[in-house]
Amino acid sequence: MIDLVIHLAGLSGVRDSLDKPTDYWKTNVIGTQRLFEYYRDVRIIYASSSTAHEPWKNPYAMSKYALERIAPANSMGMRFTTVYGPNARETMLIPRILRNDVPYINTNHSRDFIHVDDLVRAIDSLIKSNVKGITDIGSGTTNNLIELIEHFGIDCERVVGEHTERLDNLADNTLLNNIGWTPQVNLYEYIKENRNDN
């Protein structure tokens, strides 16, 4: 008998959603709706996104917000901030910093980065707690992107970020803190230990 489903599948990425809005809606909303219906009597913990906070500026954000609206009452939605760590997409900022390959940086953006190990620990805490609803999952610390690259001596083009993305995605970890979870991995220490300086 199944008593818990953890649903982490789906399409991610703001930029791709601008080119493929229908794909994002079909996968993230309609596909997940089928899962919700099939497991209607089972507790479901599912991946949402920090982009689901208002205002919704792109198809990815709207698909995640819609997903939360149709989620069953016994479910738990997880609004991930910007996840980094082993096997992260090579086009994401932290992998680019690690290999000294940052072509440009958004001058008006700040980001809350969460290490995948901390994310897994957060999910484990949610499984054990039996809480329901929606929660952010992030480090709870916002990082100005200009300050981040300057700290590591990276010189790159500076551009104003797209209006289709949030300026900041700082997580409110209150629910997770209340059940005993706090992030353990420090972003700057992680980069320092894993960066290729050659």
Q: How would you name each of these model-derived features?
A:
Residues 59-61, 65, 69-112, 116-120, ...:
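NAD(P)-dependent short-chain dehydrogenase/reductase
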Residues 103-105, 126-137:
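Core catalytic loop region at the nicotinamide-binding pocket of NAD(P)H-dependent oxidoreductases
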Residues 1-26, 54:
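NAD(P)H-binding glycine-rich loop region in Rossmannoid oxidoreductase-like domains
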Residues 186-198:
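Amphipathic terminal alpha-helices
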Residues 106, 134-135, 143-173:
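C-terminal "lid/loop" region of Rossmann-like NAD(P)-dependent oxidoreductases
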Residues 7, 33-61, 76:
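Conserved Rossmann-fold NAD(P)-dependent oxidoreductase catalytic core, especially the SDR/UDP-sugar
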Residues 11-15, 49-57, 81-84:
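Active-site segment of SDR-like NAD(P)-dependent oxidoreductases
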